[in-house]
UniProtKB/Swiss-Prot annotation:
Residue segments, region Required for USP4 activation by providing conformational flexibility between the DUSP and catalytic domains: 229-295
Active site (catalytic residues): 311, 880
Any one of the GO BP annotations: protein localization to cell surface
Gene: Usp4
Domain of life assignment: Eukaryota
Protein's recorded name: Ubiquitin carboxyl-terminal hydrolase 4
Start and end residues of each stretch annotated as Necessary for interaction with RB1 and RBL2: 459-463
GO MF annotation: an example: metal ion binding
Oligomer status and interactors: Interacts with RB1 (both dephosphorylated and hypophosphorylated forms). Interacts with RBL1 and RBL2. Interacts with ADORA2A (via cytoplasmic C-terminus); the interaction is direct. Interacts with SART3; recruits USP4 to its substrate PRPF3.
Catalytic activity: Thiol-dependent hydrolysis of ester, thioester, amide, peptide and isopeptide bonds formed by the C-terminal Gly of ubiquitin (a 76-residue protein attached to proteins as an intracellular targeting signal)
Sites of Phosphoserine modification: 445, 655, 675, 680
Amino acid sequence: MAEGRGSRERPDVETQKTELGALMGTTLQRGAQWYLIDSRWFKQWKKYVGFDSWDMYNVGEHNLFPGPIDNSGLFSDPESQTLKEHLIDELDYVLVPAEAWNKLLNWYGCVEGQQPIVRKVVEHGLFVKHCKVEVYLLELKLCENSDPTNVLSCHFSKADTIATIEKEMRKLFNIPAERETRLWNKYMSNTYEQLSKLDNTIQDAGLYQGQVLVIEPQNEDGTWPRQSLQSKSSTAPSRNFTTSSKPSASPYCSVSASLIANGDSTNSSGMHSSGVSRGGSGFSASYNCQEPPSPHIQPGLCGLGNLGNTCFMNSALQCLSNTAPLTEYFLKDEYEAEINRDNPLGMKGEIAEAYAELIKQMWSGRDTHVAPRMFKTQVGRFAPQFSGYQQQDSQELLAFILDGLHEDLNRVKKKPYLEPKDANGRPDAVVAKEAWENHRLRNDSVIVDTFHGLFKSTLVCPECAKVSVTFDPFCYLTLPLPLKKDRIMEVFLVPADPQCRPIQYRVTVPLMGAISDLCEALSKLSGIAAENMVVTDVYNHRFHKIFQMDEGLSHITPRDDIFVYEVCNTSMDGSECITLPVYFREKKSRPSSASSGAVLYGQPLLVSVPKHKLTLESLYQAVCDRISRYIKQPLPDEFLSSPLEPGACNGSRSSYEGDEEEEMDHQEEGKEQLSEVEGSGEDDQGDDHSESAQKVKGQPRHKRLFTFSLVNSCGTADINSLATDGKLLKLNSRSTLAIDWDSETRSLYFDEQESEACEKHLSMSQPQKKKKAAVALRECIELFTTMETLGEHDPWYCPTCKKHQQATKKFDLWSLPKILVVHLKRFSYNRYWRDKLDTVVEFPVRALNMSEFVCDRSARPYVYDLIAVSNHYGAMGVGHYTAYAKNRLNGKWYYFDDSSVSLASEDQIVTKAAYVLFYQRRDDECSSTSSLGSFPGSDGGVKLSSSHQGMGDEEAYNMDTN
C-alpha cells in the first residue's frame, strides 16, 4: 500500500467532515466490508477537520494534520500484521464502512507496507437478527489425512462456508480438483466428525477457535482411507458416532452427526457432536444411560474443555451444576413436562434441553471432562454477544442462562396483563404479597422457585415528600464494593540533565485527580518542581497527547505509556524559554510522495531553548546536548566547510520572528521546495544575531548528524523547513520538529540500546502501599441498602408534582430465595477509565445470616451456606475464570479450572478473585420440590448432604491461566 497521495486530491476540512459524517451512520448489512482504523489516528483526523463540535480549536492547522493512516498500534507483530488480543471498539480502534475507508485512503494514503484491516459483517441470532463486524477471525488448524503432523493455521470468517475451507485446503495440500474429498472435525487423537454439509457456514457448523480439520482424499480405487477404521469403530447401526471401539447402549450418545473413532477413548465427550435440527431441539429426550458409571469418577467432578476464551462460561456452568435443587430437577427429567415451546420470550425449549444434556453428561460419572460445544452454539444462536471467542463476563452469561431457562420452562402458557399498583399507604406485607402473587401469575418456573426473591424500593420526593413504595422480584443481588480512592500509576521521568537516563516511578494518585496531582506526587519522590514537569502520552515514537495541568487523570488508561519531562521555563539568565516537541525519524528516499517518506523511531524529546536565541544553530546544539548520552560525535576529520551549507538543514521557506504567520493551505507546496536554499535576505534581527551569524561563519564544524523539518503533530507529514541564515526562527508552542537521520549516520552514531535504557526508582521495588483491609460482605450489603439521591440524568417522575425529581432512593430486602446468588460488582468504567476492584471481600463459607437485612420481621430465619464461587483473575476485559464448588454427594470442595478438577479446602476459597457467590439456604425441615411455588421465604428447600467434615488430603493447586 503506497503512502499518502497529494493534497490536491484532498478536499477542504469542512467537506471531509460532511462526507465522512454522512457515512459513519451506515447501517451494518450482512456480508458488507468494514475497516478497522487505529483510534489514535482517527482522533487526530477528527481534530484536524473539527469533526466534534466541542473540539474546534485550531481546525485545519498544519500541526494537527494526521498524515497517512497508521494502524501499527493495533498489531502485535508488525511483520505478520496480526491484531493484538483484547482490542476494544472505540477505545483501540474505530470501524468505518468501505466507502469511508476509500475516501480516507484517497485523501491521506496509508503507511508503507501496511495492508488494510478489512472485516465482514456477520449475522447472529436465530429469531432476532443482530449484525456485527467480525473483528477477530477464527483460527483453524488444517491438515491432510495422510500426514496429520503437518498442521497449517488459517483464519476464516464465521460467515465463510465449509466449501470455502475445503477449497483452501485443496490449494494448501495440492489436491486435484477432480479428486473426491471428505472433511472431518478432529476433536481428540481418535475422534472425528464428518462435515458433510458444504453450504453450512462455520458458525452453523459450530467450529471453534483452534479446531483441527482433516481433509481426506479418496483412494484411486474409490475407497476411503478411513473406511476400514469406520467399520471397526461401532456396531450400533443407528449411531455414526462412537468414542470407543466397544458399542454403547446409551441413547444419550446417539446423535445425528457422523463421527468415527480410531480406537479406545476413555475421556472423549459426546457433547462435541450433538446435532441441531432447525425443526426441533436435536437432543435426546431422556437420560436412561445403561452404561454404568466409572467407579473411579465421582459424579459432578467433570471438567469443561476451553473452546477458546470460554473459561467464563465454564466457571458459570460449574457453579450452576453444583446448585443441587436445579441439577436434581434436570437429572430427574422433571423439565420435560414443563418445556414451554410457545413462549415468545423463550427459545423453544432449546436452551433448556441443551443445558439438560450437558448436566447429565457432567453427572454421569463416566467422563472426567467434556467439551460444551453444542451448549455454547445454542447460547450463541439466541445471545449473539456470546457467540464469538472473545472473553466475556461470567455473571452476564449466568444472567442469560437463568433467564433463558426460566422462559423455556415457564409453566404459564399465557401471561395475563396486570396493572402495576403503588402502595398508597397500605401495609408493606399486603403490598409485598400482592406483588409476589402478580409476579407468579406471569412467571412460574423452577428458576423462580429456586432463585427469585423480592426487593422493596422506596422513593421519596424532595419537594412534596411523596413516598412511593414498590416491590420487585430479583434473581441475584449485585452488591457494590466500597470504591478505592487512589490508583497506582507507573510513569517515566525524563530529567533535564541529558546524562541521566529516564527513571521509572510508581506513584499513588487520587483516582479522580488531575495531572497536577500526578506531578505533585512525582515531585515528592524526585525532588523536581512540579511546575517544571510536562506530562505526555507517548505512542508509536511520538506524543499522542501533551496534557495540561488541569486535565483529569481519568483520561489516562493503564495501557498508556506516560512520560513526564523536566523542562526549563526560564534560561540561566532569566529569559523566557520555548519548549518544542522533537521526533526522531529515519529519512527514506520517496521523491514521488507527498508524505514525508520517513519512519519514526526512538523516544521523542521536549527541548527547551531561550526564545531570544532560537536560531537553527542554537537549536541544533540544544538537541545535540539533549541526546549526547546516546550519540557519538563525528571524528575531527569529518568537517563541513560551513554549518549552513546547502542540504545541511534542508531549508527552503524560512520562518522569521516578526513575520506574519503563513497559512499552510497546501503542504505539498512546501514539500516541493524542501531541497531549495533561500538567500540570507535583509538582516532585520539586530546586531546580536548578525554577530552570532558572523561568529559561526567559516568555522570548521563537525559533520551534521541530522537535519530539521517542521512537521505535523504526528510526525508523518512535513509542513515547512527552517531558516539557515542565522536569524531567529518563527516557532511557537504548537510547533513540532523532526530530526531526520539517514540510515548510515544513524547506524554509525546513534546508540539504540542506550537510547532505550532507563533506571528504576526505589518505589518500583518497594512493596506497594498496603491496601485497605479486607471488606466484609455485610459492608457491601449495607452499602447496597444505603439511601442515595438519584442523579440529575436519572430522575424519578413524581406523580404528585407532575415532574421529574432527584428523589432519594433506598433498596431493602423483603424476602430471599433458596439459592442466593451474590454478584460482587468488581468492574467499573467510564468513558476513559476501566478498572477492576481487587478488594478482598470476606464472605462466610458457612452460616451467612441474612435475617438482619430482611425488613419483613415476620419472615423465617435466613441462614445460608456457600456452595460455589465464580472467580476472575486478571484485569477488566482480560484474564481467566475458574470456580470453586462443593460436591453435594461427598460434601468436599473442588477447584474447577476448565477441564481440570482438583480437591480444594475451605481456607482457599475466600480470595480477591471471588466474583459471584452461590449460597444455599438452610431449612429447618426437609421438603421436596412439591412445595415450590409458594411465597418466597415460606417454603422449605431440598435437603441435601451437607457434610462439613475435614477435607482430608487437600491438594494445593497452582493455577495456570490461559
